[in-house]
């Protein structure tokens, strides 16, 4: 604040802001620091201070491009929540100023992009500004409503660089959140957005398709109800897949799937993405037809998992995951259960395939969580006297049944040599536990084992889950401590890259901590638990027992 031109400010901000989820004292300090630095209204005449603030925020957002933006969302939420009931709302006012000025800066950078000398720099700045606007939209979409029409033309950006693609994806994400909040948007504006999105879906790759279909879902489902437009697109790609399937069935030895690989992959992905955001079994889409679209789509996708080369086989899984988000009941189908469980339990199966199946489960759980939170908010608005808990239990029944089906195989993925597989398995288990979909006792030994992982982020996540379980169910941890120790040894065996080296129970770093130090610290506070644990360990070495 005192030295606004100091060159290390961005670096300092990045380091501070990452502490936003630390213990209460540090969290409070971080919130106060950034409230002073960024979220205090700036006098209108002080353009220089405003520009400095914008550059500082966008520099920090750009610097965190690879590590994710959770911290920014958390910070914004903390600050806006703290003044919800206050009559004077300085943070809200500052956010409005920042959003308005970010839009001004975007228009300025766009003008200067025609100046070839600074193209790279300004293109990077443009992406950072639009990304920052998306982060604001995620927490307070109302701030962007008046700027929606300014953002729409960016959907027609000509894509030649990575930055161009990022602009399109972020603009699509902003419009997805903002357009449904607009009061009486013009027909022309909505039709233009639909046309622009459809052109992008037909022309570009997976990431663009995913974000544009998601945006189209919000615009069509919540605003225009232009179902015929989407139905035509679905039929185009569904028809292409059906045709390829029929040709392949007539002559299974033909090279038709290989020869039409690009069309096959685009059709698979687009059909999956559309099924995620639209329920084509609604009368609005298929009219009076008795055909069950979701079953037909599943049949098609499963056909290509059985008759594809390795790359095509792998690329059948993202669309399957998309279809299961809209229709979770499909995960109870016997062939889906067999397929998923065989991939998760097969030791020789490719790492990428295991990760994709775990990602599918993770995305389903995340979407389900978002859906339930939204349902909770809607109910609170409509009828405060209703029993929300009961409603949550009904809608989470399906998720609970699904996770029971795949739980064992997901937990066994903790014993994989690749850290990326363990990472996604832990994410799925954390989401499952946070939503209360399974009884936590069955996960305790596995979480103890994951607490010995060499990667700090995974260790901390597993340890945090154990702390939460211990708060709710005292005694569960010590009850499963010995089983957890045995599994810890299995995890260490799996990740031991040099089989000749013996497995050690401590970290080979400057701390030389015991791998199970977190478990010991949780048990040592209770004398009874401590003694029972030590006796159980000693009994393992008792020949007479």
Give the positions of each predicted feature:
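Short secondary-structure boundary micro-motifs
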Residues: 118-119, 287-288, 395-397, 432-434
């Amino acid at each position: 604040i005192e030295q606004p031109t100091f060159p290390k400010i961005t670096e300092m901000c990045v380091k501070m802001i990452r502490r936003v989820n630390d213990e209460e004292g540090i969290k409070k300090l971080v919130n106060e620091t950034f409230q002073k630095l960024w979220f205090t209204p700036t006098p209108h005449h002080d353009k220089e201070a405003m520009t400095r603030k914008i550059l500082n925020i966008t520099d920090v957002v750009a610097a965190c491009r690879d590590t994710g933006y959770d911290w920014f969302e958390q910070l914004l939420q903390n600050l806006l929540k703290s003044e919800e009931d206050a009559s004077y709302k300085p943070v809200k006012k500052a956010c409005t100023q920042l959003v308005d000025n970010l839009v001004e800066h975007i228009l300025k950078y766009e003008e200067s992009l025609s100046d070839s000398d600074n193209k790279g720099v300004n293109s990077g700045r443009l992406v950072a500004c639009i990304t920052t606007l998306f982060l604001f939209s995620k927490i307070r979409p109302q701030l962007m409503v008046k700027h929606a029409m300014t953002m729409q033309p960016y959907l027609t950006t000509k894509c030649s660089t990575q930055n161009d693609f990022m602009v399109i994806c972020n603009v699509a994400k902003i419009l997805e959140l903002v357009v449904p909040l607009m009061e009486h948007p013009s027909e022309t504006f909505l039709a233009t957005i639909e046309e622009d999105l459809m052109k992008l879906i037909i022309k570009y790759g997976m990431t663009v398709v995913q974000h544009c279909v998601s945006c189209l879902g919000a615009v069509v489902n919540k605003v225009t109800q232009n179902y015929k437009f989407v139905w035509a697109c679905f039929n185009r790609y569904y028809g292409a897949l059906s045709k390829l399937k029929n040709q392949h069935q007539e002559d299974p030895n033909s090279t038709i799937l290989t020869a039409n690989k690009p069309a096959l992959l685009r059709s698979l992905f687009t059909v999956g993405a559309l099924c995620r955001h639209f329920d084509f079994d609604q009368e609005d889409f298929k009219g009076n037809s008795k055909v069950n679209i979701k079953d037909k789509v599943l049949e098609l996708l499963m056909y290509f998992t059985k008759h594809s080369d390795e790359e095509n086989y792998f690329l059948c899984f993202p669309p399957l995951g998309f279809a299961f988000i809209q229709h979770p009941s499909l995960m109870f189908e016997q062939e889906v259960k067999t397929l998923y469980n065989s991939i998760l339990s097969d030791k020789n199966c490719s790492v990428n395939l295991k990760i994709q199946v775990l990602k599918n489960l993770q995305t389903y759980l995340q979407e389900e969580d978002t859906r339930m939170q939204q349902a909770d908010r809607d109910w609170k608005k409509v009828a405060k006297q209703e029993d929300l808990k009961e409603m949550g239990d009904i809608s989470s029944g399906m998720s609970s049944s699904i996770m029971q089906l795949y739980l064992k195989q997901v937990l066994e993925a903790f014993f994989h040599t690749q850290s990326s597989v363990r990472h996604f398995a832990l994410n799925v288990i954390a989401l499952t536990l946070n939503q209360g979909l399974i009884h936590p006792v069955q996960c305790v030994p596995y979480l103890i084992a994951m607490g010995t992982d060499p990667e700090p982020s995974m260790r901390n996540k597993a340890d945090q889950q154990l702390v939460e379980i211990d708060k709710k169910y005292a005694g569960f941890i010590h009850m499963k401590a010995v089983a957890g120790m045995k599994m810890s040894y299995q995890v260490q065996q799996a990740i031991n890259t040099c089989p000749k080296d013996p497995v050690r129970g401590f970290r080979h770093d400057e701390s030389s901590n015991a791998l199970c130090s977190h478990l010991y610290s949780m048990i040592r506070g209770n004398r009874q638990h401590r003694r029972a644990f030590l006796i159980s360990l000693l009994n393992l070495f008792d020949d007479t027992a």
